[in-house]
């Protein structure tokens, strides 16, 4: 899933806000935004955007598009319905909470 018409400057602001601290503070911030329904944050990979693995095994991966004004969100979970729910919740969190704080 993705957020279309997501300007590159919003993408830069979003990722700067989520990554602009030491690892422990960054992970606490990410957990506060995204991990609540998943029992906590188990790991973070910053190789290509922000890939968060939750304690329950759900994966939420946020990344800006390299060639379009959009934000992409990929999710993995035990089944398609859980992945879709995690994706919708993550995108809603970005729009309702993260951008307002960035």
For the regions a protein language model found, what residue spans apply to each?
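Phosphate-binding and adjacent anionic-ligand microenvironments
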Residues: 1-66, 70-74, 80-102
